[in-house]
């Protein structure tokens, strides 16, 4: 599933085509994706200007002039492509090659610029929903999400507070969207490696007995920010479904230190360990047991 860097890459790719333009036509080619489309989905989109395109965790949020917000989630295999008036895919981020799977083009927006934005989703785990801006705080899909890891509200004290009473592993806590929003398996493995922290470590050890953040929490926040920013700069990670809206792959997978590198030598200077893999809460965890403690 796309994680925060991939979704942010999508947002940046769609932004030039959507922001400031009006949705002239909205077309759904089936009655549902993961969930059924609202009965007034098309009517609430057509004729509306997109005043802003944001992101919350792994969700895209398009603000409409009507006061509604179009909430979009990529699911497992969802992707967007932007096509200009001449039928040429224009720069942006996150789509599959044109012509390969148009049968899976499920949603199409025609913009006032005559550009078209197409949502393709072979596995149909993605979804779209229109929510009134005034009700966004109570939206079940967003309610309860933790702080954005790249936002000003996220720091060592916030992370330590979110983990202080948890009896789960550190990795499990970081994957809990209530603790911090937008992280997934790839970037949690990478951040823990960079912070030299074991994924098996008890999450509560990020806080000292006084409740203040430990030095581990400081290291981990820095590592999370670094790995996410580097991944966004690289256009995300392309393992299975992720491509940029030009059809290009993201390149951060070439910078993985541990993820999907089982058996490789640890990349920490002077460390003689090797990357190991084990199953943790149903997911593969990659780490170096020598330098991650």
From Swiss-Prot:
SMART domains linked: Fapy_DNA_glyco (SM00898), H2TH (SM01232)
Provide the alphabetized UniProt keywords: DNA damage, DNA repair, DNA-binding, Glycosidase, Hydrolase, Lyase, Metal-binding, Multifunctional enzyme, Zinc, Zinc-finger
**What does the record give as cofactor?**
Zn(2+)
Q: What is its EC number?
A: 3.2.2.23, 4.2.99.18
The reaction(s) annotated as catalysed by this protein in its Swiss-Prot or TrEMBL entry are: Hydrolysis of DNA containing ring-opened 7-methylguanine residues, releasing 2,6-diamino-4-hydroxy-5-(N-methyl)formamidopyrimidine; 2'-deoxyribonucleotide-(2'-deoxyribose 5'-phosphate)-2'-deoxyribonucleotide-DNA = a 3'-end 2'-deoxyribonucleotide-(2,3-dehydro-2,3-deoxyribose 5'-phosphate)-DNA + a 5'-end 5'-phospho-2'-deoxyribonucleoside-DNA + H(+)
Residue ranges annotated as zinc fingers (FPG-type) are 257-293
Q: Tell me if Lipid metabolism is a UniProt keyword of this record.
A: no
Q: Name one GO molecular function term.
A: damaged DNA binding
Q: Which InterPro entries match?
A: DNA_glyclase/AP_lyase_DNA-bd, DNA_glyclase_Znf_dom_DNA_BS, Formamido-pyr_DNA_Glyclase, FPG_cat, MutM-like_N-ter, Ribosomal_uS13-like_H2TH, Znf_DNA_glyclase/AP_lyase
Residues bound to DNA = 104, 123, 166
Coiled-coil segments: none
UniProt key word DNA-binding: yes
Q: What residues sit in the active site?
A: 2 (schiff-base intermediate with dna), 3 (proton donor), 58 (proton donor), 283 (proton donor)
UniProt xrefs under NCBIfam families: fpg, PRK01103.1
What does the UniProt record say this protein does?
A: Involved in base excision repair of DNA damaged by oxidation or by mutagenic agents. Acts as a DNA glycosylase that recognizes and removes damaged bases. Has a preference for oxidized purines, such as 7,8-dihydro-8-oxoguanine (8-oxoG). Has AP (apurinic/apyrimidinic) lyase activity and introduces nicks in the DNA strand. Cleaves the DNA backbone by beta-delta elimination to generate a single-strand break at the site of the removed base with both 3'- and 5'-phosphates.
The subunit field of the Swiss-Prot or TrEMBL record says: Monomer.
Q: Which family does it belong to?
A: Belongs to the FPG family.
Q: What is this protein called?
A: Formamidopyrimidine-DNA glycosylase
> Taxonomy-wise, where does this protein's organism fall, top ranks first?
Bacteria, Pseudomonadati, Pseudomonadota, Alphaproteobacteria, Hyphomicrobiales
Q: Which gene encodes it?
A: mutM
